[in-house]
Amino acid sequence: MLGQCTLLPVLAGLLSLESALSQLCTKDNVSTCQDCIRSGPSCAWCQKLNFTGRGEPDSVRCDTPEQLLLKGCTSEYLVDPKSLAESQEDKERDQRQLSPRNVTVFLRPGQAATFKVDFQRTQDNSVDLYFLMGLSGSAQGHLSNVQTLGSDLLKALNEISRSGRIGFGSIVNMTFQHILKLTADSSQFQRELRKQLVSGKLATPKGQLDAVVQVAICLGEIGWRNGTRFLVLVTDNDFHLAKDKTLGTRQNTSDGRCHLDDGMYRSRGEPDYQSVVQLASKLAENNIQPIFVVPSRMVKTYEKLTTFIPKLTIGELSDDSSNVAQLIRNAYSKLSSIVVLNHSTIPSILKVTYDSYCSNGTSNPGKPSGDCSGVQINDQVTFQVNITASECFREQFFFIQALGFMDSVTVRVLPLCECQCQEQSQHHSLCGGKGAMECGICRCNSGYAGKNCECQTQGPSSQDLEGSCRKDNSSIMCSGLGDCICGQCECHTSDIPNKEIYGQYCECNNVNCERYDGQVCGGPERGHCSCGRCFCRYGFVGSACQCRMSTSGCLNNRMVECSGHGRCYCNRCLCDPGYQPPLCEKRPGYFHRCSEYYSCARCLKDNSAIKCRECWNLLFSNTPFSNKTCMTERDSEGCWTTYTLYQPDQSDINSIYIKESLVCAEISNTTILLGVIVGVLLAVIFLLVYCMVYLKGTQKAAKLPRKGGAQSTLAQQPHFQEPHHVEPVWNQERQGTQ
């Protein structure tokens, strides 16, 4: 619980930080009011005269409204255009289901504009229904039943509208034929249906979805009115689609144009197939609401299309087709009670979302389309339309429409990327007669620049002059410590005593250096500061002049600085790698390395030059070194050699002195006698142990019992077998020959 309580303030802080960051005004490369308002939705411009001080850039005028007010700009001088929408009230509201008719939106990049669209459902004045049926061999039973439904269908349409009309078309062997234009004559509808015959083939009518698109786009041929439009497809077969990212695998894609010639669909030589995108687009574009009536075994297959086609209704066809009229009634009730608000194609820099407030009390904000269900006649629903732009744009138009209904809203979008400033032409004298006053700043004539057009440029603009007062594009003009006058920085006088500001960009001063003993550069007697660096007087060194130049602490007893293996800094040795402070005299482990030179010592002692080639870094000395000793080393013969190593200053070569005499251990007679005695004792002990073991074994053997006396033989043993000898045959033959 404590962790949750701790987390809440953190989350609140993060939200506050995000809100604060969203209100920041980024004003890179801003020099005019237009640049300012285009740089971000939170930026405003102050057009007050003389708002900036001497040398201050015009970008100071660009900031958030709150910051500009704090800087002394009053609200009357703020230029801060806001996105807004103006709706044109509909004088014919009672005759329309969707209002308003027109909306004009003024849109500033990054700042949303909102407006409301109301939809009120009324009874339809006109409903057109086109009946499209697949007539493959398997449709014989359905055709017979549908042929008697003409009056029932028209009666169903007139129940839901003031004027209903029906039309008919068929699909036979992948070919669509438009048979009856939309009409209010149910008898004619029935007569045309009775003329139809099913195909003798049982093949699937593969062109049925292409026929759906032809019905949708051939407006004149079908006879669609500006009212509610329904397309009923009755089929007992699967569908085929062109290859796209959703469904289907075929390759020949329809061109989306009307190809009816005297009622017959004329393809381009090979069958065309619709993609889901084409199908949904053409139905929505022409405001046609599809109803697909299929047998129960095909319902799940066709329901896949509902994901991609808005307001598509799938009905289950009974075995005797008697429920077609009721399916149409149910589909109309369902489709008419669902209101889906959508818009035509818009450029990618514009974004439109919808907040839906439905009649049943539900709401659905921030969606790419408006959506309310359960809308009954005379119910009103409201949609809030939100539109934003990512950048400045040209004038745009788009339309908002409720799918399945003819009414639409025309939206005109205009960019807010220019400043509407106060008239200031009377203040042209502030520009020295060489420019005009606009939005609080001088717009200089060609050849002049500067805050008051006081600089004669022969080409460079005011912005170019300001650029010469910056070290780089990311730096502040004159480092924020000076004024840019005609392209040159005039540095301010500091209010801190003895502080001086100077440099081409006012980037230098005489105080921002390292300190020693609480003073800049150790005080004036040690050095002085210039542009962030200490310049020391004679006798002092160091980044803060903290060190004296004396080297007494770096000299060894031979008066060599750091023993030649380092440098003296601040009277202390900084030793080279491998040498030890304080005077860099010996390497770490120097005495341990004596043993490494033992073989060289013996080699040099024996004066065997050929064997001593690996001792190139040793210099043999005949003179012993004072106070330089090494422990002695012993060889395999027991002789001890004493030698001394010495490394001179400023050299990596060791000198070696080897003591002339070898100390070898001598073997005395007493030592020999002791060795003999020990050997004899060990031999006697071995013989005694052997005899004792032998006697014990003999005694154990004598105690074993004897059966049958000493005459016992192997033949008496239970496992013994008498050997059997057979005389070789060759021996007998040999005797016979003899």
Curated annotation (Swiss-Prot):
Keyword Transferase (UniProt): no
SS bond list: C25-C419, C33-C43, C36-C73, C46-C62, C218-C258, C358-C372, C421-C439, C431-C442, C444-C453, C455-C486, C469-C484, C478-C489, C491-C506, C508-C531, C513-C529, C521-C534, C536-C545, C547-C570, C554-C568, C562-C573, C575-C584, C594-C603, C600-C664
GO terms for cellular component: plasma membrane; secretory granule
Classification via InterPro entries: EGF_extracell (IPR013111), Integrin_b-2_sf (IPR015439), Integrin_beta_N (IPR033760), Integrin_bsu (IPR015812), Integrin_bsu_tail (IPR012896), Integrin_bsu_tail_dom_sf (IPR036349), Integrin_bsu_VWA (IPR002369), Integrin_dom_sf (IPR032695)
Polar residues: compositionally biased ranges: 710-719
Traits of the deletion mutant: Mice display normal neutrophil maturation and function including appropriate migration into sites of inflammation and response to bacterial infection. Following inflammatory stimulus in the peritoneal cavity, they display decreased levels of Cxcl13 due to the migration of resident Cxcl13-expressing macrophages from the peritoneal cavity during the inflammatory response.
Tissue specificity statement from the Swiss-Prot or TrEMBL entry: Expressed predominantly in maturing and mature neutrophils.
Domain PSI: 24-74
VWFA domain: residues covered: 126-329
Source domain of life: Eukaryota
PROSITE patterns: EGF_1, EGF_2, I_EGF_1, I_EGF_2
Signal peptide feature range: 1-22
Location of the I-EGF domain: 421-454, 455-507, 508-546, 547-585
Segments crossing the lipid bilayer: 672-692
PTMs per UniProt: N-glycosylated.
Segments for region (Disordered): 709-738
Cytoplasmic side: 693-738
Compartments reported by the entry: Cell membrane
Extracellular side: 23-671
Chief localisation class: membrane
Keywords: Cell membrane, Disulfide bond, EGF-like domain, Glycoprotein, Inflammatory response, Integrin, Membrane, Repeat, Signal, Transmembrane, Transmembrane helix
Similarity comment text for this entry: Belongs to the integrin beta chain family.
Function: During inflammatory stimulation, plays a role in retaining Cxcl13-expressing cells at the site of the inflammatory response.
Subunit description: Monomer and homodimer. Unlike integrin beta chains, no alpha chain partner has yet been found.
Official protein name in the record: Integrin beta-2-like protein
